[in-house]
């Protein structure tokens, strides 16, 4: 059981937000440590990695009629970098779901080091830490289904919600979630 994180756990907390002309990753070091965790500057020094991915797809206003892809590599996430990072230590993935991202490039059920996945929706690092430490009990449900892959999204019936798609369309389904630890 990876969550909640226990007191004094050594945590490498990295946010990964694609930026123009800047480093995409940022090691988060809170000014005030209200979580009884030890924040470290490298994955090697950590007991666990908390990696928060914030994919950035094209604006719908920029749409040119071509397919919108939901895989992470098409949405400014360096999956080679992410896979290298999560291979180092047990990892909690947090993903900001502005779209129903397909995360198969970095996760499947056999992923040996990914011990938990959290969906965020425009929150703050502090709120994420409140959840992973149980300072606040999680209580959330997915507002949509996420496709198991970009290919599944491209081949879906466009007029059918993901939770009504047949077979193995979804990795996470509509209304799936957690209510406390």
Q: Where in the sequence are the language-model features?
A:
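C-terminal non-catalytic regions of proteins with extracellular/luminal or membrane-system context
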Residues: 1-181
């Amino acid at each position: 059981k990876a969550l909640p994180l226990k007191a004094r756990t050594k945590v490498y907390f990295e946010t990964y937000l694609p930026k123009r002309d800047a480093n995409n990753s940022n090691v988060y070091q809170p000014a005030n440590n209200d979580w009884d965790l030890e924040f470290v500057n490298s994955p090697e020094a950590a007991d666990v990695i908390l990696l928060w991915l914030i994919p950035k797809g094209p604006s719908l206003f920029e749409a040119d009629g071509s397919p919108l892809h939901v895989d992470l590599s098409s949405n400014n996430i360096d999956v080679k970098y992410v896979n290298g990072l999560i291979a180092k230590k047990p990892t909690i993935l947090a993903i900001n779901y502005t779209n129903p991202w397909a995360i198969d490039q970095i996760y499947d059920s056999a992923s040996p080091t990914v011990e938990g996945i959290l969906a965020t929706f425009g929150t703050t690092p502090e709120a994420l830490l409140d959840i992973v430490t149980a300072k606040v009990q999680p209580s959330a449900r997915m507002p949509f289904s996420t496709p198991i892959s970009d290919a599944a999204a491209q081949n879906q019936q466009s007029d059918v919600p993901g939770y009504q798609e047949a077979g193995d369309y979804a990795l996470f389904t509509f209304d799936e979630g957690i209510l406390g630890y």
